[in-house]
Regions:
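Flexible, low-complexity junctional segments that flank or bridge functional domains
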Residues: 26-294, 302, 308, 315-322, ...
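C-terminal "post-core" interaction segments
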Residues: 259, 263-274, 280-293, 298, ...
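A general structural signal for short secondary-structure junctions and capping/turn motifs
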Residues: 3-4, 138-143, 207-210, 248-250, ...
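C-terminal motif of bacterial Sec signal peptides marking the signal peptidase cleavage site
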Residues: 21-24
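Aromatic-acidic/polar surface patches that form glycan- and anion
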Residues: 11, 52, 399
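A generic structural signal for short, non-catalytic loop/turn and secondary-structure boundary residues
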Residues: 15, 141-145, 159, 226, ...
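Bacterial N-terminal signal peptides that target proteins for export
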Residues: 1-13
């Protein structure tokens, strides 16, 4: 059945009213009913008009039906959603509640952490509200940023003798416009000198990455060796690109395509004839140079749009890749059509527009086919790069969700896939946004992806073939910009794909640019400040 959406003003106003009435279950009576009132005790869900309590209820009751591990959740009376009210800010109460919901699944547990591994909730009224939280990076699904533009830092040496480098910069950001790139050494931020007391600067570095500093003066040395003093960076809104850089590198008589990608932003043109102004030129260039081997740099890529991941798979895949690409598997409640709470959610497309049938009926998420057959996706080759044989992925603990899906789904269809870096995040599950109180989007893990061989379940992360263990010379060397063949991870990847005299042996490079002696410290905050946005699905098939 063809999905249609309407942009007329009158119907749009009606849709807004419907979202308000349905999206957050805001009624004076108890709504929705528990999953199975005859079995589970539900005496504590009394009628209320309190908006926070209604949203508390909705968050739990949606999880009871759509959470991938919904069978682990207790009854309403045992969980008591309305007890999450101790914080002044409602969003913090809902985050606390969601965190406690996910504690019932061992897959969501992060030892010692006060946040869920996968689930999150955001306030859409906040600036860049569709981002997860301060613990995630600052580009939204359409590559709009609101920050200084620094992805993260890397620190090499000991706590008393170390150097700090910018590890990534978003294109067109304030940092990029000031000439700061990956490879820029930072020696001072404001009055805080950097290099001799690591513990004393962690708070300042984190403040930059968390947007707690709205403006700051930076001093240091640019990647080309040019010193700079008191360059002011101020948080601003900007249009960026998810592609850090791409190039063709010639080594050992072979052209290797290199591509550094920050997130799976929504396609510039989606639907049945997709295209993307950021990705298409990259792979056209690879095709024109006869590339058969790729290095795909996902070390700072925490996921994004599933549709974009599928499109990228179709750009990468050789012409021999046909048939099934992957499946999305939902829980039994959803597959059997028993997730009746989804009647409260108007079905939207990737841009948030409500979808209607050809007869004008507004679709809800209850109209979606959640079966395995309805959520199986197939190869449909895109672009002119048709002969890819070998791929090396550069990865880290911030490589998650759609990034891991890309790796898992291409494996059965090329000759060789190798990973260089540190273990990935481990997130084979995804979600779609649930609107609550016409204000909050809850992202509750609802499906798991499996490749064409039925492989998946990498909850513990993917372990690299060439592991950066801090001792073997393989290092995320932020002294070099993306695409520089001397950078540690890329140097290792090139030695795998196009070995020359120095080569690699047992996961070692013969030489890596020197870093200060001692332990290599990496500044982290809540998952390494990589934009762990998840694996977001916005395409759905209507039940027949």
């Amino acid at each position: 059945m063809k999905l249609l959406f309407w942009s007329g003003k009158s119907k749009f106003l009606i849709a807004l009213l419907l979202i308000t009435a349905l999206g957050a279950c805001k009624k004076s009576k108890v709504n929705p009913d528990p999953v199975d009132p005859a079995v589970e005790s539900n005496t504590k869900q009394t009628p209320t008009t309190n908006r926070r309590e209604l949203t508390n209820d909705s968050l739990f009751l949606y999880a009871k039906q759509i959470y991938f591990w919904n069978t682990t959740l207790p009854s309403y009376d045992v969980f008591e959603p309305r007890k999450y009210k101790t914080y002044p800010l409602d969003l913090d109460n809902f985050r606390d509640e969601l965190f406690n919901i996910t504690k019932y699944s061992t897959f969501e547990t992060v030892p010692g952490a006060n946040y869920s591994k996968y689930a999150y909730i955001v306030d859409n009224t906040e600036s860049n509200g569709n981002q997860a939280s301060a613990k995630f990076a600052s580009l939204d699904a359409n590559d709009v940023g609101y920050d200084m533009g620094i992805v993260t830092f890397r620190n090499y040496g000991t706590e008393t003798n170390y150097t700090t480098y910018v590890a990534g910069v978003y294109p067109n950001s304030p940092a990029a416009n000031a000439g700061i790139t990956r490879g820029t050494q930072i020696t001072k931020i404001g009055n805080v000198s950097i290099g001799t007391n690591f513990n004393s600067v962690v708070q300042t570095l984190n403040a930059v990455l968390n947007n707690r500093l709205t403006t700051a003066l930076f001093s240091g040395i640019k990647a080309d060796g040019t010193p700079f003093t008191d360059v002011r960076l101020t948080i601003a809104r900007y249009n960026s690109s998810s592609v850090f850089t791409s190039k063709v590198i010639t080594q050992g008589g072979k052209n290797v395509g290199y591509f550094a990608y920050s997130r799976f932003s929504v396609l510039t043109v989606g639907g049945k004839t997709p295209s993307d102004v950021r990705l298409d030129p990259v792979f056209a260039e690879f095709a024109s140079k006869g590339v058969t081997d790729l290095v795909i740099d996902l070390r700072y890529n925490g996921g994004g749009s599933v549709e974009t991941a599928e499109y990228l798979l179709n750009l990468i895949a050789p012409s021999t890749a046909t048939g099934k690409m992957y499946q999305e598997l939902y829980n039994n409640t959803m597959k059997t059509g028993k997730a009746t709470i989804l009647e409260k959610q108007p079905l939207t497309d990737g841009s948030g527009k409500i979808l209607y049938s050809s007869s004008g009926k507004m679709y809800t998420y209850d109209d979606v086919d959640w079966t395995e057959a309805g959520n199986t996706y197939y190869f449909s080759k895109k672009g002119s790069l048709t002969g890819v044989k070998n791929i090396v992925f550069l990865v880290s603990g911030g490589t998650a969700s759609a990034s891991e899906m890309l790796i898992n789904c291409i494996k059965p269809h090329v000759q060789s896939v190798k990973l260089v870096g540190t273990k990935t995040y481990g997130k084979p599950v995804g979600f779609f946004p649930i609107l609550l109180d016409n204000r909050y989007n809850a992202y509750i893990p609802s499906f798991e992806t499996r490749n064409s061989r039925g492989e998946g379940g990498y909850y513990a992360g993917m372990t690299p073939d060439y592991l950066d263990d801090g001792n073997n010379g393989i290092v995320d060397d932020a002294k070099y910009d993306f695409g520089n063949p001397n950078e540690g991870y890329l140097k290792t990847a090139l030695s795998i794909l196009a070995p020359v005299a120095q080569g690699v042996s047992s996961g070692r490079t013969s030489s890596v640019a020197s870093t200060p002696a001692g332990n290599i410290k990496t500044l982290t905050f809540a998952n390494d400040n990589i934009e762990n946005v998840g694996m977001i699905e916005t395409r759905f098939k209507i039940k027949k």
